[in-house]
């Protein structure tokens, strides 16, 4: 009799995806982050569901409903902080996952890479709308500033912004629709993740050397299931340390003040994971130019397969490209720091230089380093 794992129509799909999946024998811990992202998504959906049971999406009661969750609901405080800091863990894993794809040339799987970019945009939209829901000062002003950027679109901008707001300012209608979208988007993300995996399993995983590994595969279970569990334990350790010792470390103190349209906070800034894009936005004095740079800072990922000039797939044996890659990482960290600073000297000029460097490294220096390395191979 055939094993039910291999014959049952539903279990068979799971078997081919997570159990009998042929995986390269040499993939490193940088390949753990895909599964960690899946865990983060499940955690966010579950904690979010329990929060939604007690949250009210009305401007008059939203702030106090979050306070009620933390004070009166059984273990509400831990659910709330797991959800808030879980988002930070999600983005840490996301950035490492994308960085891994860049470093090891995984972007040559075009469909998987492009679905990944769509996923990145969707997760960012979800996180932004989630940040608005507690209806604190930074929630309200963050929503006002970021949605207002759409008014830079010629001709239809102002109409579009008012359509998104559901009125002439960020108000009850905005909060209600943001809650609705924040609830539905994680399920759309889950569907996209399935498509992402479907395309990945068409080609099989990449590996650190970038060389096809068809002749050297091992089953996913038990080797990589055990390896993923280790990564998961470290993720849980980090998340629980954050939640139980310093839950507000990554938040903004202004968000503990209820939203007040008549009082602007001294420094409006988004959550830490958007600061790099926010710094790029602010570094351009023109509104439309800033918005375009903001979108392009992430959309540029779609150009990377086209900009791949190297004869080798991975950066494992390409020291020049490695230097450019780590410069890019350092530049993104600089942009993240600048995004959280006030708009004054010397932060403005540092932000502008870091923004120019960001686009230059991707568009000029990466292909240039690859071309030089190709020529060095001839010697």
Curated annotation (Swiss-Prot):
Known cofactor(s): heme b
Topology in the lipid bilayer: Multi-pass membrane protein
Write one Gene Ontology MF term.
Answer: metal ion binding
Source domain of life is Eukaryota
Tell me the Gene Ontology biological-process terms attached to this UniProt entry: mitochondrial electron transport, ubiquinol to cytochrome c
Q: Any keyword Transmembrane helix?
A: yes
UniProt keyword list: Electron transport, Heme, Iron, Membrane, Metal-binding, Mitochondrion, Mitochondrion inner membrane, Respiratory chain, Transmembrane, Transmembrane helix, Transport, Ubiquinone
Positions binding a ubiquinone in this chain are 201
Which positions, given as ranges, span the membrane?
A: 33-53, 77-98, 113-133, 178-198, 226-246, 288-308, 320-340, 347-367
The record's annotation in CDD domains points to: cytochrome_b_C, Cytochrome_b_N
Instruction: Answer yes or no on keyword rRNA processing.
Output: no
Q: Per UniProt, where does heme b b562 bind?
A: 83, 182
Cited SUPFAM superfamilies:
a domain/subunit of cytochrome bc1 complex (Ubiquinol-cytochrome c reductase) (SSF81648), Transmembrane di-heme cytochromes (SSF81342)
One GO CC annotation:
mitochondrial inner membrane
Tell me the compartments it is located in: Mitochondrion inner membrane
Its chief place of residence is mitochondrion
Tell me which residues bind heme b b566.
97, 196
Cofactor stoichiometry and binding remark: Binds 2 heme b groups non-covalently.
Q: Name one Pfam family in it.
A: Cytochrome_B
Similarity section: Belongs to the cytochrome b family.
Q: What does this protein do?
A: Component of the ubiquinol-cytochrome c reductase complex (complex III or cytochrome b-c1 complex) that is part of the mitochondrial respiratory chain. The b-c1 complex mediates electron transfer from ubiquinol to cytochrome c. Contributes to the generation of a proton gradient across the mitochondrial membrane that is then used for ATP synthesis.
Q: How does it assemble?
A: The cytochrome bc1 complex contains 11 subunits: 3 respiratory subunits (MT-CYB, CYC1 and UQCRFS1), 2 core proteins (UQCRC1 and UQCRC2) and 6 low-molecular weight proteins (UQCRH/QCR6, UQCRB/QCR7, UQCRQ/QCR8, UQCR10/QCR9, UQCR11/QCR10 and a cleavage product of UQCRFS1). This cytochrome bc1 complex then forms a dimer.
UniProt miscellaneous comment: Heme 1 (or BL or b562) is low-potential and absorbs at about 562 nm, and heme 2 (or BH or b566) is high-potential and absorbs at about 566 nm.
Designated name of the protein: Cytochrome b
What species does this protein belong to?
Equus caballus (Horse)
């Amino acid at each position: 009799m055939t094993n039910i794992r291999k014959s049952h129509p539903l279990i068979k799909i799971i078997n081919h995806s997570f159990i009998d999946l042929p995986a390269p024998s040499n993939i490193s811990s940088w390949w753990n982050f895909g599964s960690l992202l899946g865990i983060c998504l499940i955690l966010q959906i579950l904690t979010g569901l329990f929060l939604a049971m007690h949250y009210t999406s009305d401007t008059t009661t939203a702030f106090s409903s979050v306070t009620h969750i933390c004070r009166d609901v059984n273990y509400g405080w831990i659910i709330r902080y797991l959800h808030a800091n879980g988002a930070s863990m999600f983005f840490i894993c996301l950035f490492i996952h994308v960085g891994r794809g860049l470093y090891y040339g995984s972007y040559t799987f075009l469909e998987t890479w492009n679905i990944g970019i769509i996923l990145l945009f969707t997760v960012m939209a979800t996180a932004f709308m989630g940040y608005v829901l507690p209806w604190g000062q930074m929630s309200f002003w963050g929503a006002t500033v970021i949605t207002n950027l759409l008014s830079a679109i010629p001709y239809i901008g102002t109409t579009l912004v008012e359509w998104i707001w559901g009125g002439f300012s960020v108000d009850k209608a905005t909060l209600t629709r943001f809650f609705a979208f924040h609830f539905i988007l994680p399920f759309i993300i889950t569907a996209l993740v399935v498509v992402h995996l479907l395309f990945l399993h068409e080609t099989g995983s990449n590996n650190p050397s970038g060389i096809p590994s068809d002749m050297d595969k091992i089953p996913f279970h038990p080797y990589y299931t055990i390896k993923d569990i280790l990564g998961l334990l470290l993720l849980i350790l980090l998340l629980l340390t954050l939640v139980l010792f310093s839950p507000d470390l990554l938040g903004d103190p202004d968000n503990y003040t209820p939203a007040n349209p008549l009082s602007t906070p001294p420094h409006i800034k988004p959550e830490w994971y958007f600061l790099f894009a926010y710094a790029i936005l602010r570094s351009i004095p023109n509104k439309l130019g800033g918005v375009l740079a903001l979108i392009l800072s992430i959309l540029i990922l779609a150009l990377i397969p086209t900009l791949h000039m190297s004869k080798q797939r991975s950066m494992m044996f390409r020291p020049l490209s490695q230097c450019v890659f780590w410069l890019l990482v350092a530049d993104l960290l600089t942009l993240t720091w600048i995004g959280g600073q006030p708009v004054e000297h010397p932060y403005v000029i540092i932000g502008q230089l870091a923004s120019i460097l960001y686009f230059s490294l991707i568009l000029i220096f990466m292909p240039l380093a690859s071309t030089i390395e190709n020529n060095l191979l001839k010697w």
